């Protein structure tokens, strides 16, 4: 039996916290209807599918690379690390790994990167959904801790509202200080110049 593992991440483009990645091996005997790129699904639909995936998948794992690892390694290498952890965290070993995107983590299993794989390969779609639901849950927890930033709405991505909150309050402890917009804000505060947020 060929055990195909799908892998995807979320949080690369955010400017807060770490990277979430998921690996998932679906059970061919229990196909799950409605799997597709998590970004094309409503939050409620993602949550419903995530529960179904957890119930019927042969194996799944959600892993992270921490904020500190993103800062130390850079977002690209932290993403690959989170993916590697997710694959290695599976309770059964896959025969083949399919990763959304163009870069592959270092694993000792045959692997293939597929652009837009989260819309093409059901196991990648499932991984995409699991990672997204896990990260969104963490964003709600961060919102409880730092409500002034609105993490519950923009999920840490640099929207206009997020920029305005950063201008008003400065970065929180979970903002990625190595990211250019955050770094420039910190430099700007030192110089009392924050024109980039005007």
Swiss-Prot record:
As cofactor, the record names: Mn(2+); Mg(2+)
Biological role: Endonuclease that specifically degrades the RNA of RNA-DNA hybrids.
The segment(s) forming the RNase H type-2 domain are 2-191
**Which keywords fit this entry according to its UniProt record?**
Cytoplasm, Endonuclease, Hydrolase, Manganese, Metal-binding, Nuclease
Keyword Nucleus assigned to the entry: answer is: no
| Organism of provenance | Desulforamulus reducens (strain ATCC BAA-1160 / DSM 100696 / MI-1)
Q: Where in the cell is it found?
A: Cytoplasm
Alphabetical list of InterPro entries matching this protein: RNase_HII (IPR022898), RNase_HII/HIII (IPR001352), RNase_HII/HIII_dom (IPR024567), RNaseH-like_sf (IPR012337), RNaseH_sf (IPR036397)
Group of enzyme by EC: hydrolase
Query: PANTHER family given for it?
Result: RIBONUCLEASE H2 SUBUNIT A (PTHR10954), RIBONUCLEASE HII (PTHR10954:SF18)
GO MF terms listed in the record are: manganese ion binding; RNA binding; RNA-DNA hybrid ribonuclease activity
Kindly give the PROSITE patterns that the UniProt entry links to this protein: RNASE_H_2
A Gene Ontology biological process noted in the UniProt record is: DNA replication, removal of RNA primer
* Reaction catalyzed: Endonucleolytic cleavage to 5'-phosphomonoester
Homology family: Belongs to the RNase HII family.
Report the Gene3D superfamilies cross-referenced here: Ribonuclease H-like superfamily/Ribonuclease H
**Intrachain disulfide bonds:** none
- Binding note for cofactor: Manganese or magnesium. Binds 1 divalent metal ion per monomer in the absence of substrate. May bind a second metal ion after substrate binding.
Q: Where does a divalent metal cation bind?
A: 8-9, 100
Q: What is its EC number?
A: 3.1.26.4
Q: Name one GO cellular component term.
A: cytoplasm
The encoding gene: rnhB
What HAMAP family does the annotation carry?
RNase_HII_B
- Its name, as the record gives it, is Ribonuclease HII
């Amino acid at each position: 039996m060929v055990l195909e593992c799908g892998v995807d991440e979320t949080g690369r483009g955010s400017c807060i916290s770490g990277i979430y990645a998921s690996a998932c091996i679906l059970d061919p005997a229990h196909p799950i209807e409605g799997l597709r790129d998590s970004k094309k699904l409503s939050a409620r639909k993602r949550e419903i599918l995530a529960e179904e995936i957890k119930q019927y998948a042969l194996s799944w794992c959600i892993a992270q690379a921490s904020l500190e690892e993103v800062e130390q390694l850079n977002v690209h290498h932290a993403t690959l690390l989170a993916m590697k952890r997710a694959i290695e965290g599976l309770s059964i070993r896959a025969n083949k790994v399919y990763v959304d995107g163009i870069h592959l983590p270092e694993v000792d299993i045959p692997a293939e990167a597929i652009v837009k794989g989260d819309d093409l390969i059901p196991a990648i779609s499932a991984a995409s959904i699991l990672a997204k639901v896990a990260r969104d849950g963490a964003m709600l927890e961060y919102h409880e801790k730092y409500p002034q930033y609105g993490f519950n709405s923009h999920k840490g991505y640099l929207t206009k509202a997020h920029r305005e909150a950063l201008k008003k309050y400065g970065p929180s402890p979970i903002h990625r200080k190595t990211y250019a917009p955050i770094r420039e804000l910190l430099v700007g505060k030192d110089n009392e110049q924050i024109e980039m947020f005007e």
